[in-house]
Amino acid sequence: MEQSIIEGVPGRYWHRLEDGRIQCDVCPRYCKLHEGQRGLCFVRARQNDQMLLTTYGRSSGFCIDPIEKKPLNHFLPGTPVLSFGTAGCNLTCKFCQNWDISKARALDRVQDKASPEAIAEAAVRSGCRSVAFTYNDPVIFLEYAIDVAQACRARGIKTVAVSAGYIAPEPRVEFFGHMDVANIDLKGFTEGFYKTLCSGKLSSVLETLEYLKHETNVWFEITTLLIPGENDSADEIEAESRWVMDRLGPDVPLHFTAFHPDWKMLDTPPTPPQTLKMARRIAIEAGLRYVYTGNIHDSVGQSTYCHGCGTTLIGRDWYDLTAWNLTADGRCGDCGVPCAGVFDAGHGYWGARRQPVRVQAVANS
């Protein structure tokens, strides 16, 4: 049992149990803690008989990315987004592509410090249209994320949650009530996959997706990392695609991205490009209008097409925009059919750059 806990701020969503433990109610794990213990996420801890968030105001680093890297293809294309994460995660994915951050167990990994107001100010001064909570799941630092979102909204900056959607019903309402945009990682489409490789439950993620679609105005897209031999069968891809079509509708963008050997799955080979292209074809045949490939060079699979006439609406080459055929109100320039998403009259010009940022320095400049 760990007795030394770093400073933190009081956390929300917990209650006392009759046996003296306290239960964290942020995610479906419902960790039950004695004094001095941390939850599985590592950043929510019991100290002095209350729940603390130990990473408030601390980050593993800030960087300006292209919005397409989140990935988000239907939200202010071409614009820069100020991205950051903290440490820890409430899933245990053996294939984690950001394991050095999400699996961090030494809080010296989060040395960059910034207040919510400083982050919002840095976004404005850097010309970013949005701030993204990414690299690790913002659900576990929801108090910090919500405060940042409120500061950003006051400055006209949108907020983006890149999340696995593994959150309990009550905090789900508050958390997404402060977000403008989300990309939800739908990691597989069987309970066996979630249990074996993530120590989680598929059903909880599907509940989040249906909540976002039917009970919020959050623009969201879905990403599935296809792992050879684990979640890449044609049957599973078809089942996922049909579920998205039936429960969420044809306009929710779906990204199939390539796995590379990492964390505890170093012996698993990278995803072949043909698997991603197969998945895209299956999803389109299921009725989805906006299906993308990622982590490979595939300009066809990364571009956006009109579902009315088939013309290219947004051409992409990696993170660079190569074509734009949308009207000021987000319609096809050829046939006038609307394209689902959040668009300006034109696109941004950030390109593929990735620029590290010292938030306090920028905010104080």
Walk through the language-model features, giving the residues of each.
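Iron-sulfur (Fe-S) cluster-binding segments and ferredoxin-like electron-carrier domains
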Residues: 30-54, 98-108, 315-319, 339-346
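Conserved Radical SAM active-site core
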Residues: 46-181, 350-358
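A generic "binding-loop/recognition-motif" signal
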Residues: 37, 89, 190
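Conserved AdoMet/S-adenosylmethionine-binding subsite of the radical SAM
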Residues: 113-274, 279
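Auxiliary Fe-S-binding modules of radical SAM enzymes
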Residues: 1-35, 229-365
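Generic structural "secondary-structure junction" signal
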Residues: 24, 33, 42-43, 54-58, ...
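Short, cysteine/histidine-rich loop/knuckle motifs that typically chelate Zn2+
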Residues: 26, 40-43, 88-91, 95, ...
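Flexible, acidic/Gly-rich N-terminal and inter-domain linker regions that tether
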Residues: 1-79
